Amino acid sequence: MTSVLFTCAGQRVDIVGAFRRAGATAVAADANPLAPALYHADVHALVPRIEDPGYVPALRALVEQHDVRLIVPLTDLDQVVLARSRAELGAVVLLPDAEIVERLGDKYLAHLLFEERGIATPPTWLPNGVPDDAAYPLLVKARHGFGSRHIYRAADAAQLGFFLGYTPVESIVQACLGGEEFSIDVFCDLEGRCLNAIPRTMIESKGGESIKGMSIRDQQLIELARDVAEKLQLVGPANIQCFRVADGSHYLTDINTRFGGGFPLPLAAGGRYPELALALARGEHPEPRLGDFREGIVMTRFFSDLSLTPNGDGTLKPLSVDRSED
């Protein structure tokens, strides 16, 4: 079996479980002993925080101890560190080049990158660069990070000034697009070739993550995602977010170089992304199968819970409930 190390495991029980069902041995790492995904892996380990100099050496030790072939980050938090440390880690890191990861993690630099590569994107400015004739409404958005925290809609210049003073984080200003928003989950090989792209509607989101959606067979979106993924030389999973405006054109707003929050939907639609990832770890070269998925699959997500008990050595383990008396 191929061993896979999941970093910043957090709450991504869905991803850890999907890889195990695909035949992987899951090794989950996190700094927080209460991260639920730790306890759904075959092996789990507590590691230093990302900013600690011991973070990468701790991951390398897990790679050596468990013969890890593939490293999969489950949040944006450590992607730059991992992308810069490929040689030291000693396993395939499922991320694009470090420069692409860094630029996509900064919404203003991502906007410039899209323009450089000929990818349509909404007009975007730094706060001191908004032109006087900019059309309102405008969005004030956090420059870094993920989710929908610190996003404000300004109806006029007075509101724009207020929100730029109110927001606690470094921000950008972006044109507010009409039309419908879509997410496209892509998976690319280690050479940046797009193997599949699965569009989905955004029926409902919470905290920036899709919690309700439906897979759709939209050839324009599939081709858009392939073109974007290959222009940027993406590697592994990525979630591409875009708007389709009234004239039918598309504008990219964000790309997350990881499995998106709506990952259960492309998985249920037959995307087989964990199997593709394991094939790459084994040195195989899967052929592209664009459009190979089921349309009309609806996802609705919900919260679950996990009870833990002390393990006797300062660690925790899942609580085993005896129901013999029920």
Write out the residue ranges for each language-model feature:
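ATP-dependent carboxylate activation and anion-phosphoryl transfer catalytic cores
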Residues: A45, H66, R217-D326
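Active-site nucleotide/adenylate-binding loops and adjacent lid/helix of ATP-dependent enzymes
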Residues: G90, V101-G178, L190-R193, Q219, ...
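Phosphate-binding site of ATP-dependent enzymes
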Residues: A155-Q233, F243-Y251
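Short, charged, surface-exposed secondary-structure boundary motifs
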Residues: A37-H40, G54-P57, V101-Y108, H150-I151, ...
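ATP-binding N-terminal substructure of ATP-dependent carboxylate-amine bond-forming enzymes
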Residues: M1-P96
